């Protein structure tokens, strides 16, 4: 019968596939993004897309040197020859009229691209006329761009000396015009177009002269006495652009079917010349009936996209833009295609000129030079579009049939869609992105284009950056003017992506009234919650630290809109609505008072108990900024601040460190507002701390909690350098053996053997005491911790009176508590706040200076961290606590300390003579009382002035910026853990297969029967006395806790894997450990007897350092005891619930998913809880108590009825109470007297009893095998089967010449294998198993 009671199946996982399925279905604890990521924002995007020097071409000089009817002497023209200039035959009319008509036509052609520019023609000019024209245009243009168009078809070719030709007044001579002079007149920025043979020569000469100018400028700058420095400085030509029709050695084509100014035609009438050139190609024969005359009759206008001609122009723009974006470097693309509308048009058309003119062995030249584009694949798409258009012309013109629109844009969007569906890893960006931009304003393609654009932006910040660089911003900004409801979700998504990467767009939105669009979306109850969430984020960005945005959104009724959605079931929406509220009234008093009128703060209170930690954190942020306004105070506002503060104070023991960090920041706002009040409270507290003795620890006798006197063995509080600065993380994987025997000298001069407690954690900790700006704390951790513990005793209240219970007093208590928080980031922030007030209070005390001192206080610096010399100090090892309580004049001089070894502290130092000492150097680091400080002559007002700014500047959590990262990341992509082909998924599969193998093999060994368990398979000396030991369920790793550190051993290889400090204070000890997510990504939970819980990752990892995932105060008001249960826990992986109890009167249940307390079940006893065991299937909790009782609770029932059974058969301390996991599991309990009792939870009495050895110190029950192991103070371990029969004793270590084992301090069975780990007071840890032949 007993055997049946102890024997349990594989926790209901008898079949391999069932067990494997359970692994997949088990929830993972502390694996959310808030646990895996650092709480900080993304790195800000360099705004390369936003043009800082956007320009306009405001003036255009059209210089035509045609001399109609007279050919220049150095050009021999063919017969027939190209004659058309600006599509005018100059011989069809008189020379003068022809010249004027050509000039007028050229101006019209340019006006199509820039109608607002100022145009000036200079027809067959002289040098003076050109000079006058250029200087006039430059003078009027100021800093804007001027265009100089030069047609030199009627004059000789440019010279190698850098000259072009114009005329004399009588047209009897060609006069040279130096490019150097032209540069001087035109200035910069300018763009030059040269349409003449050998035009490349001009470009070369231009560059040479520009370089010469730069050298002259440099000489004048270096030597003011140089003759060049006395002359007017020449303008720099750096910002000049040139377009030339051909290379330096080339002539313009003279084919009669082409215009003579082919280059100009390409630049100014691209569609006309492109169609004409297309008709001259052989491929046009495939389209019958198309002639040069027919293409002149293409219906429509260039600027009307609905017509054939307009559609062709639109397609041409899209294609040339796309070619440029795909070929040009990004910065060059921005400069040439996005900076200036006219320049962009000319360069798009220049790509056509290159394609057409290269077919006639003529190569257009540009400066800056472009990569070749004439062979780009997109030209084929252009040819197809032209082909489709021209093929319709005969029927359209002759028969009047309707025009069929080109499928070009639809096909390009499909190509873009294909690129998106094929994956983006290691691929170049989609070349169709500029085309998507082109169709955003087209009603036909807009919806599809926005959808595809959104999917592209969802790929990540790089995609957003790419889209912004291509010029998407003005288009999506303009679309906010649309009232189409179907666009709302798409636009909201796109804008959320943009603002998540570049928040500076907030100003553009407000300027264009874009915020009104999002206000209407957020107020729309028919919008899905996901899109309202994005809208709330967008508005939160608009009002973030931007007064104009705050004012605009306040007028738009944002506060009321947000308040209506605080109770929305969508948690992300609740989170961002709260953040949005917090930002709109941050440093904006009008919004705060609007919030007061709407009772916003009271409506936010409900979110403080939200099940989602991020929502609670957002609510704390919003309430923190609500009380953080620096406007003038009234009684009403003060009352509101007090109410908010007291509501926030309830989160002091929230399970999420993220929430508690935000709580510190919120309370710091209150501290800044009511600084003088807090200074008074601080002085009051410190005075009481000095006079009031700390209550003594309690001792447990017979399982009851009773106070005892303080004794010399009571652990001292640790020094300031060890707490609140847990930052040092070493790179060494193992503890250096040379440090094992290293002696460190304490202040008393005694030598102590190395232990984790002798190492300081942070070389950045305070070495002297001064202003908070240097992180040099006036209040040590010891002082703060004592203040916290003293203030928790009600007797103190009567000493100080009613004022002690004021709001400021309560908030000070909260900050004291948070300064001792187990999570270092929280305690660091709280220490900063407390010390800021302490610093301010000492400055206000106006001390007098000390003159006659033989030695001055300068505390020894914190022990430096040597990365290669000691164990991981992730949690921070406390150094030997200081015993000094020096007076202000009995001090030691600062000693130079080696960086290689922890510092030693001499007790005395030579006198330094009377001198002035900095204020911050005259305080003992660990002084007992909050003193007003030594006197000094320097004025502290300057230091005090920066006090508020210190708190405000340093009080940042990064929560809001971190939350915004969600919108910058892919939300449409399948999470990697759900992707069947991902690395993470494969690793999980491997782990679950391993788990199945371990379960199967272990069960096979157990089924063979266990007759002995004394084969020692592992033995090693632990760095500290083992207090808790825990097997990993599936890897050969065992965790061994000593008082304040954790060591990991590989029990198969016999190697030490890791050793790090847990971070708990010196006067506390680790009393429990649990592996979380043991089946997958394992974490280690540690519990200490001060009620703190810490969770670690990356332990026993050769590539990473241990890292604290989270920490919180699992139990508050734990009574300090010299002998007690400490903290006991039990973990339910299936539900993610953590049961905790110990030296308290309750069993507290934590939901690790929500990181919040679920319930407190009263134990109904006056003694401590010594053991906990739970069963998720029946919701039962079994507690063993120090008074010998076993109590069963059903957590589904009301608190007054949940204790369903109490067994009082044990008469002494219960060592173990175990609830078997299978559905009909029994309760097995053992007391220190060795009586093992079996209970059926349905029965009022035990169903069986057996007696084992007395004087137990540790006991465990194997969850699978029929085994009980117990350890004794009498230096042996006994193993029993379920019938109470002794299997074997273990009294001696193997291979130690019969050395006797020490007193057993802890032991534990492996969850699956028949392995037993035993820790003893002689520092040794050993693992025993069945005989080798059985294994």
Curated annotation (Swiss-Prot):
Post-translational modifications reported in the UniProt record: Insulin-stimulated phosphorylation at Ser-863 by MTOR and MAPK8 regulates mTORC1 activity. Phosphorylated at Ser-863 by NLK in response to stress, disrupting the interaction with small GTPases Rag (RagA/RRAGA, RagB/RRAGB, RagC/RRAGC and/or RagD/RRAGD), thereby preventing lysosome recruitment and activation of the mTORC1 complex. Osmotic stress also induces phosphorylation at Ser-696, Thr-706 and Ser-863 by MAPK8. Ser-863 phosphorylation is required for phosphorylation at Ser-855 and Ser-859.
Disulfide feature: none
WD repeat residue intervals: 1020-1061, 1065-1106, 1121-1160, 1164-1203, 1209-1249, 1251-1291, 1299-1335
Effect ascribed to mutating residue 722 to A: Abolishes AMPK-mediated phosphorylation. In Raptor(AA) mutant; knockin mice display higher mTORC1 activity
Covalent link location (Glycyl lysine isopeptide (Lys-Gly) (interchain with G-Cter in ubiquitin)): 932, 948
UniProt keyword list: Acetylation, Cytoplasm, Glycoprotein, Isopeptide bond, Lysosome, Phosphoprotein, Repeat, Ubl conjugation, WD repeat
Biased composition (Low complexity): 755-771, 877-887
Modified residues (Phosphoserine): 44, 122, 696, 719, 721-722, 738, 791-792, 836, 855, 859, 863, 877, 982
SUPFAM superfamilies: ARM repeat, WD40 repeat-like
GO biological process: cellular response to amino acid stimulus; cellular response to glucose stimulus; cellular response to hypoxia; cellular response to nutrient levels; cellular response to osmotic stress; DNA damage response; negative regulation of autophagy; negative regulation of insulin secretion
Glycosylation positions in this chain: 700
Location of region: Disordered: 749-771, 853-942
Impact upon substituting residue 863 to A: Abolished phosphorylation by NLK, leading to impaired inhibition of the mTORC1 complex in response to osmotic stress
Phenotype upon gene inactivation: Early embryonic lethality. Conditional deletion in osteoclasts leads to an increase in bone mass with decreased bone resorption due to impaired osteoclast differentiation. Conditional deletion in odontoblasts leads to a dentinogenesis imperfecta phenotype, characterized by smaller tooth volume, a thinner dentin layer and a larger pulp chamber. Conditional knockout mice in excitatory neurons do not show any prosocial effects of lysergic acid diethylamide (LSD) unlike control mice.
Record carries keyword Plastid: no
UniProt-annotated location(s): Cytoplasm; Lysosome; Cytoplasmic granule
Gene3D superfamilies: Leucine-rich Repeat Variant, YVTN repeat-like/Quinoprotein amine dehydrogenase
Protein task: Component of the mechanistic target of rapamycin complex 1 (mTORC1), an evolutionarily conserved central nutrient sensor that stimulates anabolic reactions and macromolecule biosynthesis to promote cellular biomass generation and growth. In response to nutrients, growth factors or amino acids, mTORC1 is recruited to the lysosome membrane and promotes protein, lipid and nucleotide synthesis by phosphorylating several substrates, such as ribosomal protein S6 kinase (RPS6KB1 and RPS6KB2) and EIF4EBP1 (4E-BP1).
Subunit field text: Part of the mechanistic target of rapamycin complex 1 (mTORC1) which contains MTOR, MLST8 and RPTOR. mTORC1 associates with AKT1S1/PRAS40, which inhibits its activity. mTORC1 associates with DEPTOR, which regulates its activity. mTORC1 binds to and is inhibited by FKBP12-rapamycin. Forms a complex with MTOR under both leucine-rich and -poor conditions. Interacts with (via TOS motifs) EIF4EBP1 and RPS6KB1; interaction is independent of its association with MTOR.
Name of the protein in its database record: Regulatory-associated protein of mTOR
Taxonomic classification: Eukaryota, Metazoa, Chordata, Craniata, Vertebrata
Gene: Rptor
């Amino acid at each position: 019968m007993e055997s049946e009671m102890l024997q349990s199946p594989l926790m209901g996982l008898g079949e391999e596939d069932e067990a494997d399925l359970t692994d997949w279905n088990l929830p993972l604890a502390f694996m959310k993004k808030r646990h895996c990521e650092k709480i900080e924002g993304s790195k800000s995007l360099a705004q390369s897309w936003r043009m800082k020097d956007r320009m306009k071409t405001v003036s255009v000089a059209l210089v035509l040197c045609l001399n109609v009817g007279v050919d220049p002497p150095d050009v021999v023209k063919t017969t027939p020859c190209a004659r058309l200039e600006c599509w005018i035959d100059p011989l069809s009319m008189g020379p003068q009229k022809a010249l004027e008509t050509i000039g007028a036509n050229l101006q019209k052609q340019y006006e199509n691209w820039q109608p607002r520019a100022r145009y000036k023609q200079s027809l067959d000019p002289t040098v003076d006329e050109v000079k006058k024209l250029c200087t006039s245009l430059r003078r009027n243009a100021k800093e804007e761009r001027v265009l100089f168009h030069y047609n030199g078809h009627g004059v000789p070719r440019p010279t190698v000396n850098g000259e072009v030709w114009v005329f004399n007044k009588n047209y009897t001579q060609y006069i040279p015009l130096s490019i150097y002079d032209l540069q001087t007149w035109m200035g910069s920025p300018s763009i030059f177009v040269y349409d003449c043979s050998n035009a490349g020569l001009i470009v070369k000469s231009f560059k040479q002269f520009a370089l010469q100018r730069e050298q002259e400028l440099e000489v004048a700058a270096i030597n003011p006495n140089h003759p060049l420095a006395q002359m007017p400085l020449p303008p720099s030509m750096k910002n000049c652009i040139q377009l030339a029709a051909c290379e330096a050695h080339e002539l313009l084509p003279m084919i009669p079917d082409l215009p003579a100014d082919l280059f100009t035609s390409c630049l100014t009438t691209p569609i006309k010349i492109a169609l004409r050139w297309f008709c001259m190609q052989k491929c046009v024969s495939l389209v019958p009936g198309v002639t040069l005359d027919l293409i002149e009759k293409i219906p429509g206008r260039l600027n009307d996209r609905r017509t054939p001609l307009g559609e062709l122009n639109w397609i041409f723009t899209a294609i040339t833009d796309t070619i440029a974006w795909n070929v040009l470097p990004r910065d060059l693309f921005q400069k040439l295609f996005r900076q200036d509308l006219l320049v962009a048009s000319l360069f798009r058309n220049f790509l056509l000129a290159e394609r057409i003119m290269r077919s006639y062995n003529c190569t257009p030249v540009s400066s800056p030079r472009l990569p070749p584009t004439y062979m780009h694949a997109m030209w084929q798409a252009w040819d197809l579009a032209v082909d489709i258009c021209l093929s319709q012309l005969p029927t359209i013109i002759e028969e009047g049939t309707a025009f069929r629109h080109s499928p070009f844009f639809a096909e390009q969007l499909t190509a873009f869609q294909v690129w998106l569906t094929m994956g983006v890893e290691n691929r170049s960006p989609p070349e169709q992105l500029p085309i998507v931009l082109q169709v955003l304003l087209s009603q036909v393609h807009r919806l599809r284009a926005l959808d595809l654009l959104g999917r592209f932006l969802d790929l990540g910040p790089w995609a957003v950056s790419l889209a912004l660089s291509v010029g998407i911003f003005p288009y999506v900004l303009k679309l906010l003017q649309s009232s189409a409801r179907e666009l709302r979700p798409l636009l909201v998504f796109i804008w959320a992506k943009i603002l998540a990467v570049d928040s500076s767009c907030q100003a553009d939105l407000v300027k264009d009234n874009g915020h009104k669009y999002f206000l209407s979306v957020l107020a729309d109850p028919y919008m899905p919650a996901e899109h309202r969430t994005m809208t709330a984020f967008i508005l939160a960005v608009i009002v973030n630290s931007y007064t104009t945005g705050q004012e605009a959104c306040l007028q738009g009724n944002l506060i009321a809109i947000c308040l209506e959605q605080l109770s929305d079931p969508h948690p992300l929406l609740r989170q961002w609505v709260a953040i949005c509220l917090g930002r709109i009234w941050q440093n904006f008093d009008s919004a705060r008072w609007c919030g007061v009128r709407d009772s916003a703060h009271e409506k936010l209170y409900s979110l403080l108990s939200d099940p989602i930690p991020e929502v609670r954190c957002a609510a704390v942020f919003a309430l923190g900024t609500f009380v953080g306004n620096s406007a003038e105070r009234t009684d009403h506002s003060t009352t509101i601040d007090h109410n908010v503060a007291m509501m926030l104070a309830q989160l002091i023991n929230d399970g999420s460190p993220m929430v508690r960090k935000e709580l510190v920041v919120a309370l710091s706002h209150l501290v800044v507002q009511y600084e003088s009040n807090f200074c008074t409270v601080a002085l009051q507290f410190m005075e009481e701390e000095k006079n009031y003795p700390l209550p003594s620890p309690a001792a447990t006798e017979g399982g009851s909690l009773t106070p005892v006197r303080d004794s010399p063995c009571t652990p001292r509080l640790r020094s300031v350098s060890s707490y609140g600065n847990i930052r040092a993380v070493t790179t060494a994987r193992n503890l250096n053996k040379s440090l094992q025997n290293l002696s460190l000298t304490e202040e008393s001069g005694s030598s102590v053997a190395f232990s984790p407690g002798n190492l300081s954690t942070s070389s950045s900790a305070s070495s002297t005491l001064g202003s908070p700006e240097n992180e040099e704390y006036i209040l040590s951790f010891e002082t703060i911790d004592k203040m916290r513990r003293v203030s928790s005793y009600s007797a103190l209240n009567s000493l100080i009176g009613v004022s002690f219970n004021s709001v400021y007093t309560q908030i000070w208590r909260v900050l004291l508590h948070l300064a001792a928080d187990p999570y270092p980031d929280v305690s660091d922030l709280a220490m900063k706040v407390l010390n800021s007030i302490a610093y301010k209070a000492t400055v206000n005390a106006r001390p007098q200076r000390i003159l006659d001192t033989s030695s001055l206080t300068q505390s020894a610096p914190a022990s430096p961290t040597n990365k290669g010399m000691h164990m991981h100090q992730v949690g921070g090892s406390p150094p030997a606590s200081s015993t000094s309580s020096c007076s202000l004049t009995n001090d030691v001089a600062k000693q130079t300390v080696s960086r290689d070894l922890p510092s030693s502290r001499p007790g005395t130092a030579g006198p330094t003579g009377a001198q002035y000492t900095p204020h911050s150097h005259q305080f003992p680091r660990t002084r007992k009382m909050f003193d007003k400080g030594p006197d000094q002559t320097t004025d502290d007002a300057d230091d005090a002035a920066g006090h508020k700014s210190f708190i405000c500047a340093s009080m940042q959590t990064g929560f809001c910026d971190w939350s915004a990262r969600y919108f910058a990341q892919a939300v449409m992509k399948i999470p990697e853990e759900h992707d069947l082909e991902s690395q993470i998924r494969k690793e999980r599969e491997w782990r679950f297969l391993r788990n199945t193998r371990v379960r199967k093999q272990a069960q096979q060994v157990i089924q063979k029967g266990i007759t002995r368990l004394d084969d020692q398979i592992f033995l090693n000396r632990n760095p500290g006395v083992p207090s808790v030991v825990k097997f990993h369920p599936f890897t050969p790793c065992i965790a061994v806790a000593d008082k304040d550190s954790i060591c990991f051993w590989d029990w198969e290889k016999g190697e030490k894997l890791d050793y790090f400090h847990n971070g708990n204070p010196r006067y506390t000890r680790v009393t429990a450990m649990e592996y979380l997510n043991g089946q997958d990504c394992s974490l280690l939970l540690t519990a200490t007897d001060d009620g703190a819980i810490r969770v670690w990752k990356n332990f026993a990892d050769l590539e990473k350092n241990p890292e604290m995932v989270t920490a919180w105060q699992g139990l508050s008001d734990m009574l300090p005891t010299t002998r007690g249960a400490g903290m006991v826990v039990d973990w339910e992986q299936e539900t993610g619930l953590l049961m905790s109890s110990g030296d308290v009167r309750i069993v507290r249940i934590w939901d690790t998913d929500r990181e919040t307390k679920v319930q407190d079940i009263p134990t109904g006893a006056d003694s401590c809880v010594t053991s906990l065991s739970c069963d998720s299937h029946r919701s039962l909790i079994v507690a063993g108590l120090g008074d010998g009782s076993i109590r069963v609770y059903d957590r589904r029932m009301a608190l007054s009825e949940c204790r369903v059974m109490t067994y009082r058969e044990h008469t002494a301390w219960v060592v173990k109470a175990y609830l078997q996991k299978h559905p009909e599991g029994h309760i097995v309990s053992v007391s220190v007297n060795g009586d093992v009792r079996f209970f059926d939870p349905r029965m009022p009495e035990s169903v069986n009893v057996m007696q084992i050895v007395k004087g137990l110190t540790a006991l465990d029950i194997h969850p699978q095998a029929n085994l009980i192991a117990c350890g004794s103070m009498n230096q042996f371990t006994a193993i029993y089967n379920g019938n109470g029969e002794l299997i074997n004793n273990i009294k001696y270590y193997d291979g130690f010449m019969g050395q006797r084992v020490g007193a057993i301090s802890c032991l534990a069975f492996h969850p699956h294998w028949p392995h037993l780990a035993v820790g003893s007071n002689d520092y040794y840890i050993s693992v025993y198993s069945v005989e080798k032949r059985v294994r």
